[in-house]
């Protein structure tokens, strides 16, 4: 398989501020009206700060140009990972998650940043957390032009759920941790999310092993109903992807199996191309830093791994790629990374194609 990368550019940043200019953890999809929609956490100070908002950019020309970022979710807490999924005739779900005020104070305690501390002091902590703390989502019923109120789920994942044949959404994610700490009952669980925001528990995926955290999964449902889940599994010195499958609609899952080396990279995003090929793109946080992908020609039974899309990263704060197929058959992948040594992370786009050797 030959890989041809023919475009890379920055598509989402903040030219008006050197302070609130960090963007990360994007997702991209094609809406029902043909436009592309990219969401991310933006207008941040840095990787961990209380100022994150979920923003959206739109493209009407297959990613040649994008609108400026518009805010979709903005709670008093730190709105992180942006996920997006269209479903039904005109509905669009945008997902995020946040963490507690305590977590923000704990993370930023070494910096003693008066700006951050002043903001945290201004929050009505109890009221904000009672209303917003959790894995959050909003729903649009007009192809992403307007969105309803913030609602919450018990699980979280970077790129959001996937549509089911019956009109619901299959939401497979890590159980939400309010302080972003490893919990005793931490695991990956499957839920069915309905269009009205209600949900029901389906099943669980067993953890790989004690001491290894399973988190940040992404899911795909194949035409025959097979469900494939790629899971980030990590601890210090271990950062890779495992795969689990379900053949009964998410009620039960196979024991996760390792796909990459112990430092192979994560988290992943799965996409089925028009010819049936599956691709799973993931961040690579070892030198040379960048974005890689694997592909499968047999519905995820086997994978050809460690194909490089981009390897010019300036450090390990990058990744979370997400892909969509363009009308001409090419693939558009978004991810986050710094553009310069001194600059903040911004959202990048790559256009590429796979051809037979």
What does each of the following model-derived ranges do?
Residues 1-357:
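Asp-box/BNR beta-propeller blade signature and adjacent active/binding-site loops
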